[in-house]
């Protein structure tokens, strides 16, 4: 599959914010754990998170985006240590609230970190980690679409965002 071509201004890189949960047993994938057990469900959470981070890092290496991981279920110090281990410099805690509240918070926090007064804010991609088939082509396509549109919603067949 040919990758879409994306041309970005040097200082106009979007940020891909990965929304994930810490892979602690009994604290993630609660619906799945009922069928396969909490230990196996936590392993799946960890694998999905690692896969999504690796795909996003490929985009970052190409100079097309910055990445940030917003994690839930772990403290900030442990999150930063985990981020260093995974070669992710920008790690944040999601904070309290439902998923919509957490997404809104990360959007505005990321926008405020990036915005220079009197400049158009850079694009922000919020994605979850329950995407086993996500590829760098998917992210590049989203970045390309965001260069021409204010918002992009990707398809979801499981009721998520």
Pin down the residues of each PLM region.
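Short aromatic-hydrophobic micro-motifs that form the base-stacking/packing surface
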Residues: 123-127
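Short, charged/polar "capping" segments at the starts of alpha-helices
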Residues: 74-80
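N-terminal nucleotide-binding beta1-loop-alpha1 segment
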Residues: 2-32
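A short, N-terminal amphipathic alpha-helix
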Residues: 45-63
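Conserved donor-nucleotide/metal-binding helix-loop-beta segment in metal-dependent transferases, i.e.
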Residues: 132-159
């Amino acid at each position: 599959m040919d990758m879409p071509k994306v041309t970005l201004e040097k200082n106009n890189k979007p940020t891909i914010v990965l929304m994930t949960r810490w892979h602690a047993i009994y604290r993630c994938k609660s619906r799945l754990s009922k069928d396969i057990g909490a230990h196996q469900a936590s392993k799946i959470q960890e694998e999905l998170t690692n896969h999504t981070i690796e795909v996003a890092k490929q985009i970052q290496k190409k100079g097309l985006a910055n990445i940030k991981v917003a994690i839930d279920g772990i403290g900030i110090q442990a999150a930063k240590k985990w981020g260093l281990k995974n070669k992710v410099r920008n790690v944040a805690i999601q904070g309290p609230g439902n998923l919509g509240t957490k997404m809104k918070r990360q959007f505005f926090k990321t926008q405020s970190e990036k915005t220079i007064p009197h400049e158009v804010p850079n694009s922000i991609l919020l994605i979850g980690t329950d995407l086993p088939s996500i590829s760098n082509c998917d992210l590049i396509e989203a970045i390309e679409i965001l260069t021409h549109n204010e918002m992009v919603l990707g398809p979801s067949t499981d009721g998520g965002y």
